[in-house]
Curated annotation (Swiss-Prot):
The record marks 118, 299, 303 as: Substrate specificity. GO terms for molecular function: heme binding; iron ion binding; monooxygenase activity; oxidoreductase activity, acting on paired donors, with incorporation or reduction of molecular oxygen. It comes from Pastinaca sativa. The keyword Translocase does not apply. It catalyses: psoralen + reduced [NADPH--hemoprotein reductase] + O2 = xanthotoxol + oxidized [NADPH--hemoprotein reductase] + H2O + H(+); 6-methoxycoumarin + reduced [NADPH--hemoprotein reductase] + O2 = scopoletin + oxidized [NADPH--hemoprotein reductase] + H2O + H(+). Disulfide bonds: none annotated. This is Xanthotoxol synthase. Heme binds at residue 444. The chain crosses the membrane at residues 3-23. Keywords: Endoplasmic reticulum, Heme, Iron, Membrane, Metal-binding, Microsome, Monooxygenase, Oxidoreductase, Transmembrane, Transmembrane helix. It comes from the Eukaryota. The gene is CYP71AZ4. Induction: Accumulates in roots after wounding. GO terms for cellular component: endoplasmic reticulum; membrane. Its main location: membrane.
Length: 504
């Protein structure tokens, strides 16, 4: 049974008693930011739980309550930040106050109690891991010599598979196609092994990654209502988490054991496991290596696949933009087997298409939540200052900011041209109306790699193929409805039909 449903049944009588004794308190004369009225004890948990898409629901609430909005998720206070000015305050000006992570059951278990980058609490271990990843794993040099040749090979393979589907007049599941592409890149670069599409090992690997993503998004009662933590065991969700963790741990250990074999031939530049084993020491333990592999897989596969799905969704729904992007890539590239990274620099409209995709469909619609390490004061102006308590979870509403008409003209229109008017808008997190990869100390470490995967992948999709809706559908039938999850994903699968483009 759903753990949330069990909890709601049990919580109603407790909420009634709680209402008799609860009084809202002000701290140092300042109150918390405004927010919708929640249920006693439960807070706003029920409203968010029953919403079809949590980030859309939260974003709509913020339109009513403002750029700083308080929610109560059971016993946990939460702050939703929905303006560039307040995002800058949280992610830059007071970054040191807000740069830690809440320790949640799912992410805590899967990250080996925070031994990696994305979910680790702020501290010396996180700084050491971040430094090692920045200087060793995700460098421009490694992107050039490790990722690039693998990416170009996988692009050729993807184009070949799509050509076969086109010859057979078959519809293609876009997410499966694009995650196969991303999975092959990440697996080859991370541990030097490729899983073929018909190989049982790849099916197991992709299922494991999907199960891990589901656990990151899963609801654990103990995170928000500690006294009811036993419900996680009763519902079975804790057992599922333990099973997924054990499967993941065994998989990582087998990979590491293979790399430790003395007779194993080492690649010219070394894969990511090779690099980490060479740096193994006081802070980088075997569990740390496994935890960082989790970051690489979870951050590099689903996000790339979803970004390409939403890019193709937007282009299919906007044929003017599709044709303009195809004309650019085909006229600039001429006749080549594939579009490579050097070509991307000559395709400003294609790059604007990717930027516009990440504005409308940010990979993390609420970013990975941060947590306030101490009390602080936030406010848009002197008349609207609020006290933020320690241990408040902070969600930066990139979904809402990217669709706010105060900052974007015709925000719901897919219009890549807007980025020619604002060339300063990029992925570095310095313009706070545009934060697809976050900002500050916790900005995504793999921006360059993710950007290259999406740009090169999309360029080749537009260069080699024309695209039609699936059998029996029209372009107008294609929706862009998202679903719940830590990473943005499309609710309804996108099926598309490729047609080989014959270059004149």
């Amino acid at each position: 049974m759903d753990p949330a449903a069990i909890f709601l049944i049990l919580a109603i009588p407790i909420a009634s008693v709680y209402l008799l004794f609860y009084h809202k308190k002000r701290v140092n004369g300042l109150s918390s930011p405004p927010g919708p009225r929640g249920l006693p004890f439960i807070g706003h948990f029920y409203q968010i739980y029953k919403s079809e898409c949590a980030h859309e629901y939260i974003s709509n609430l913020s339109k009513q309550y403002g750029s700083l909005m308080t929610l109560h998720l059971g016993s946990v206070p939460a702050l939703v930040v929905s303006s560039p000015k307040m995002a800058q305050e949280v992610l830059k000006t007071q970054d040191l106050v807000f740069c830690s992570r809440a320790q949640m059951t799912g992410s805590g278990k899967l990250s080996y109690n925070g031994l990696e980058m994305a979910f680790a609490p702020y501290g010396e271990h996180w700084r050491n891991v971040r430094k090692m990843c920045t200087l060793e794993l995700f460098t421009q040099k490694r992107a050039q010599f490790n990722f690039r040749p693998v990416r170009e090979d996988e692009v050729s393979r993807m184009v070949g598979r799509l050509s076969e589907a086109a010859a057979a007049s078959e519809d293609v599941n876009a997410y499966e196609c694009f995650t196969n592409f991303a999975t092959s890149i990440i697996s080859r670069v991370a541990f030097g092994k490729r899983y073929d599409e018909d190989n049982l090992g790849k099916e197991k690997f992709q299922r494991m990654v999907a199960d891990i993503e589901a656990m990151f998004a899963a609801f654990f009662v103990s995170d928000f209502f500690p006294m009811f933590g036993w419900i996680d065991r009763l519902s079975g969700v804790k057992a599922v988490l333990d099973r997924n963790f054990n499967e993941m741990d065994t998989f990582y250990q087998e990979l590491i054991d293979e790399h430790l074999k003395p007779d194993r031939p080492e690649s010219l530049n070394g894969d990511l496991i090779d690099v980490m084993l060479k740096n193994k020491g006081s802070f980088l333990t075997m569990d740390s290596i496994k935890a960082i592999l989790l970051n690489v897989f979870s951050g590099g596969i689903g996000t790339t696949g979803s970004a390409l799905v939403f890019a193709m969704t937007a282009l299919l729904r906007n044929q003017r933009v599709m044709k303009k992007a195809q004309e650019e890539v085909r006229s600039v590239i001429g006749k080549k087997e594939i579009v490579d990274e050097d070509d991307i620099q000559k395709l400003p409209y294609l790059r604007a298409v990717v930027k516009e995709t990440l504005r409308l469909y940010p990979p993390g619609p609420l970013l990975i939540p941060r947590v306030a390490m101490e009390s602080c004061v936030l406010g848009e102006d002197e008349d609207h200052m609020y006290m933020i308590k320690p241990n408040t979870i902070v969600y930066v509403n990139t979904w809402g900011i990217g669709r706010d008409p105060k900052y974007w003209k015709n925000p719901l229109e897919f219009m890549p041209e807007r980025f020619f008017e604002r060339p300063d808008l990029n992925y570095t997190g310095q313009q706070f109306e545009y934060l697809p990869f976050g900002s500050g100390r916790r900005i995504c470490a793999g921006i360059i790699i993710g950007q290259n995967n999406v740009e090169v992948g999309l360029a080749n999709l537009l260069y080699s193929f024309d695209w039609e809706p699936p059998t029996g559908k029209t372009f107008e039938d294609i929706d862009d409805q998202p679903c719940n999850g830590l990473t943005l994903a499309k609710k309804n699968p996108l099926y598309i039909r490729p047609k080989i483009y014959v270059h004149p």
